[in-house]
Amino acid sequence: MALLVHFLPLLALLALWEPKPTQAFVKQHLCGPHLVEALYLVCGERGFFYTPKSRREVEDPQVEQLELGGSPGDLQTLALEVARQKRGIVDQCCTSICSLYQLENYCN
């Protein structure tokens, strides 16, 4: 019984002790090469889907709008709609913050 009384404060301390999360599990901004390195780390041999568009393949909403005969005022509305629809990895992890668990969604 006396032994239990001596260890009771230690047991209480261990029960209340909460380790800090490691940096790997903390949500953080990941941009550019840091984002790619994190994807390699998380996905490993599975790999991840990444096909960058060349400058010519990137859609230009202004050119597309002019081809459709729209007015320049409509271009701002279109740009806002496109910005709202973007929910890619850069928006999720660079513009915003994400965890390594969220990065797993982009693995093959």
Swiss-Prot record:
Cysteines paired by S-S bonds: C31-C94, C43-C107, C93-C98
Signal peptide coordinates: 1-24
Top-level taxonomic group: Eukaryota
Keyword Metal-binding carried by entry: no
Annotated localization: Secreted
Pfam family, one: Insulin
One GO term of the biological process aspect: cellular response to glucose stimulus
Keyword terms, alphabetized: Carbohydrate metabolism, Cleavage on pair of basic residues, Disulfide bond, Glucose metabolism, Hormone, Secreted, Signal
Principal cellular location given in the protein's record: secreted
TM ranges: none
Residues making up the propeptide: 57-85
InterPro entries membership: Insulin, Insulin-like, Insulin-like_sf, Insulin_CS, Insulin_family
Quaternary structure and interacting proteins, as annotated: Heterodimer of a B chain and an A chain linked by two disulfide bonds.
Family statement: Belongs to the insulin family.
Protein name, as recorded: Insulin-1
